[in-house]
Amino acid sequence: MWSSAEIRKTFLEYFEERGHSVVESSSLVPVNDPTLLFTNAGMNQFKDVFLGLDKRKYVRATSSQKCVRAGGKHNDLDTVGRTPRHHTFFEMLGNFSFGDYFKREAIGYAWEFLTEVVGLPEEKLWVTIYQDDDEAADLWPEISGIDPGRIVRLGEKDNFWSMGDTGPCGPCSEILYDRGIEYSCGAPDCGIGVCDCDRWLEIWNLVFMQFNRDESGEMTPLPRPSIDTGMGLERLSSILQGVDSNFDTDLFIPIIKRIEELTGKAYEQGERGFPFRVIADHSRACSFLIADGVLPSNDGRGYVLRRILRRALRFGRFLGIEGSFLYKNVDVVCDIMQEAYPELLEKQDFIKEVIRLEEERFLLTLNDGLKKAEEIMERARQRGDNVIPGEEAFMLYDTYGFPLDLTEDMAEENQFTLDKAGFDRSMEEQRQRARQANKGEDLLGQERLLSEKLAGIAPSSFTGYENSRDESVLLAIIKGSELMDKALNGEEVILITARTPFYAESGGQVADCGIIKGQEGLLRVQDVKKLSAWILHYGIVEGVLTTGEGVSLQLDDPARMDTARNHTATHLLHRALREVLGEHAQQKGSLVEPARLRFDFSHLKALSSEELSRIEQMVNEAIWKLYPVTTTVTALGQAREMGAMALFGEKYGEEVRVVQVDTYSSELCGGTHVQNTGQIGLFKITGEGSIGSGLRRIEAITGSYALEYIKQLEDELKKAASALRSSPLELAKRIENLNNSLKEKDKEIENLLQRLSRSSSDELVNKAFQLNDAWILIEEVDIEDPGSLRQNAEMLKDKLGRAIVMLASIKGEKVSFVCFVSKDLLEQGLHAGKIVAAAAQVAGGGGGGRPDMAQAGGRDKSKISEALAEARKMVKKTLS
């Protein structure tokens, strides 16, 4: 029997033997692609190659790509576990041709691999083609010998692929496996393209990228057609391992067995096994996403991870697990996948810790959600209402991760109803906002359009590592998206020159600013960006600039130097963080500009003042040691052998630039730096905080900015010391003494308030009366705060013993009621929820709650006496 590891290895070796370069799976976090939330197909990392924006040394490639489909346009989250095939995380095996081979070879490779290498029976294989693709219809029988009766023509929806509204596109051909009539849905017309039953299992999709579609929809043949194929490893494994579901393969069974151990329950097929399948799938997705740098948060990718993780926890609770458990599955996931993805093993402990902390956070969140739900119901009672608004239920779900079914249960327990239509409305509004926010495809279309118009313009040459000024030729002027011959005074334009010292925004470093000067005008450069091979200078024209004229380019030297100080400082900071906190404290993002630096890194808790002090001291010591800073351009593999760190979220070519700070630090980096650490002068941390679960941020300044900051701190310290009649060095002790004095005063005030409260309680107790050995206290009080009202009522109930206590208070125009019934009176039929509901109804409101404790609200404060009288009447009747 084939193992999944053998299938993956055999696939890659098969294509490598046929001239394909084996390319590592790219990260699940797409690099420089705003159209994607997660990598969801093997072709994602080759998108720029297909678009002609990037070139590789190879024209044939093969890969086993990590993919996630959860969130965004491609979202299988709610289907996971309900079907045998859908997953949040999966692997896509693929082979690609960039203008090399085409349909004949792609069909031949696919057929040979399936029938001869892994041995699938030919008679079990079916093929779909695009309805107008006669070429594929002829090639399939010729190459494979397949019976034309097993070739099905389908329309554009099923068998035509495109990258977007415009750009590369083409027909596709899918290979399906017939699992047999016993798996049929039983419909008379059951067949490929008619139904989605489990008889017809889609295995491999071959995309024939042969056209370019323009804005009018017209398609013209590509000069060099390409191939993009994808086959799910999980699906092929299920066939070759002879099991009915992907979840029964060796990719999932060890995880499911671990869940059985954790729950003490046996896995079953069908509906009973649904929670096991969800947890197994989500364990894989969480492990791989965290390994690729995604951390739980409230937006973007982190929000999707949080949803996946919390969904798994909910199903764990369904299986009877109350505490943290999901992190215990990570070891099993790593054991299954470590050979193909060694990064999992390297980050195993970090992945477990992130998941464990998020689990604990969610358990607290559930408690917070319970409190919030109580507050929502209390506000409804104050309004005289017993409906939980849909938008508030959605807030519980979205902000607190509070499952809707728990909100529904709470509503039922408290005799409330839930506005489900309002909840659905809020959910749809959020989806609309997400769709509005995802403008990446528009951006990609604009870049593609601009690239097409610049096709005849020579690439820009960056000279800014060596120079801060240069002489060049103005190659192009762009206004809007049109090429212009001239740029006039006041116009906002983009300039492209043959040579430029201006650094384009990249890798967290902001663009250079400065001036591009021509014979009759100039451009004050406000921003610089890179588009493929061109460097674009953005700004507003003063005078007139003309295409083809000679221009002088001059950077703002002080700003460039300040930026260089901060960029080199981030490298020193990165090293110090890993020294003090551990190797897991790796860069997750940065901002480098003249006035400051910002550095994001992975760490699971706030830094102590001692840790911050050590980090700051280490950076300053590296500065004062006057380390030389050198750069080397070398092959990516050679750079890794040199020990250079590759940073998360960066896209590297085959040649990379290594920035070395003596033996202290070595990183792949394209930014600008000082020549010697002494040029940084001084480093000062100004802030540290959380920007998401497991993600911290340090803000800092260097050079003259750091010196000015320290002077400001000193001035403020002197002012504070003067105000408190102290010296700066004795200020902390003076503040401590003042705090101690304030605490003593607070205690005195608290004692006075408690004595006052006891006095008020004693007065109320005297108003209680007895009926059949039960104390009854139903009174109006002057306590506006609902929490205090509830606290006082409970205290009075405890003081009276066998009692029913109901208090009412007025706030504004509304009335609040709270009622407590001692447990020994519940058997006599007293029900707090019914009592407050009756009283609230008299006051024009509503509410209810549990038999032992309930709250309600009324709209008419003038009816408070009648409401209390109604409550007394009801209690007397019940006890009599």
UniProtKB/Swiss-Prot annotation:
<feature type="binding site">
    <location>
        <position position="567"/>
    </location>
    <ligand>
        <name>Zn(2+)</name>
    </ligand>
</feature>
<dbReference type="GO" id="GO:0002161">
    <property type="term" value="F:aminoacyl-tRNA deacylase activity"/>
</dbReference>
<feature type="binding site">
    <location>
        <position position="571"/>
    </location>
    <ligand>
        <name>Zn(2+)</name>
    </ligand>
</feature>
<feature type="binding site">
    <location>
        <position position="669"/>
    </location>
    <ligand>
        <name>Zn(2+)</name>
    </ligand>
</feature>
<dbReference type="InterPro" id="IPR012947">
    <property type="entry name" value="tRNA_SAD"/>
</dbReference>
<keyword id="KW-0694">RNA-binding</keyword>
<dbReference type="InterPro" id="IPR002318">
    <property type="entry name" value="Ala-tRNA-lgiase_IIc"/>
</dbReference>
<keyword id="KW-0067">ATP-binding</keyword>
<dbReference type="GO" id="GO:0140096">
    <property type="term" value="F:catalytic activity, acting on a protein"/>
</dbReference>
<dbReference type="InterPro" id="IPR009000">
    <property type="entry name" value="Transl_B-barrel_sf"/>
</dbReference>
<dbReference type="GO" id="GO:0016740">
    <property type="term" value="F:transferase activity"/>
</dbReference>
<feature type="binding site">
    <location>
        <position position="673"/>
    </location>
    <ligand>
        <name>Zn(2+)</name>
    </ligand>
</feature>
<dbReference type="InterPro" id="IPR018164">
    <property type="entry name" value="Ala-tRNA-synth_IIc_N"/>
</dbReference>
<dbReference type="GO" id="GO:0006419">
    <property type="term" value="P:alanyl-tRNA aminoacylation"/>
</dbReference>
<keyword id="KW-0547">Nucleotide-binding</keyword>
<dbReference type="GO" id="GO:0004813">
    <property type="term" value="F:alanine-tRNA ligase activity"/>
</dbReference>
<dbReference type="Pfam" id="PF02272">
    <property type="entry name" value="DHHA1"/>
</dbReference>
<keyword id="KW-0436">Ligase</keyword>
<protein>
    <recommendedName>
        <fullName>Alanine--tRNA ligase</fullName>
        <ecNumber>6.1.1.7</ecNumber>
    </recommendedName>
</protein>
<dbReference type="InterPro" id="IPR023033">
    <property type="entry name" value="Ala_tRNA_ligase_euk/bac"/>
</dbReference>
<dbReference type="InterPro" id="IPR050058">
    <property type="entry name" value="Ala-tRNA_ligase"/>
</dbReference>
<keyword id="KW-0820">tRNA-binding</keyword>
<keyword id="KW-0963">Cytoplasm</keyword>
<dbReference type="GO" id="GO:0005829">
    <property type="term" value="C:cytosol"/>
</dbReference>
<keyword id="KW-0648">Protein biosynthesis</keyword>
<dbReference type="InterPro" id="IPR003156">
    <property type="entry name" value="DHHA1_dom"/>
</dbReference>
<dbReference type="InterPro" id="IPR018163">
    <property type="entry name" value="Thr/Ala-tRNA-synth_IIc_edit"/>
</dbReference>
<comment type="function">
    <text>Catalyzes the attachment of alanine to tRNA(Ala) in a two-step reaction: alanine is first activated by ATP to form Ala-AMP and then transferred to the acceptor end of tRNA(Ala). Also edits incorrectly charged Ser-tRNA(Ala) and Gly-tRNA(Ala) via its editing domain.</text>
</comment>
<dbReference type="InterPro" id="IPR018165">
    <property type="entry name" value="Ala-tRNA-synth_IIc_core"/>
</dbReference>
<keyword id="KW-0862">Zinc</keyword>
<comment type="similarity">
    <text>Belongs to the class-II aminoacyl-tRNA synthetase family.</text>
</comment>
<dbReference type="InterPro" id="IPR018162">
    <property type="entry name" value="Ala-tRNA-ligase_IIc_anticod-bd"/>
</dbReference>
<dbReference type="InterPro" id="IPR045864">
    <property type="entry name" value="aa-tRNA-synth_II/BPL/LPL"/>
</dbReference>
<dbReference type="GO" id="GO:0008270">
    <property type="term" value="F:zinc ion binding"/>
</dbReference>
<dbReference type="GO" id="GO:0005524">
    <property type="term" value="F:ATP binding"/>
</dbReference>
<keyword id="KW-0479">Metal-binding</keyword>
<keyword id="KW-0030">Aminoacyl-tRNA synthetase</keyword>
<dbReference type="Pfam" id="PF07973">
    <property type="entry name" value="tRNA_SAD"/>
</dbReference>
<dbReference type="GO" id="GO:0000049">
    <property type="term" value="F:tRNA binding"/>
</dbReference>
<dbReference type="Pfam" id="PF01411">
    <property type="entry name" value="tRNA-synt_2c"/>
</dbReference>
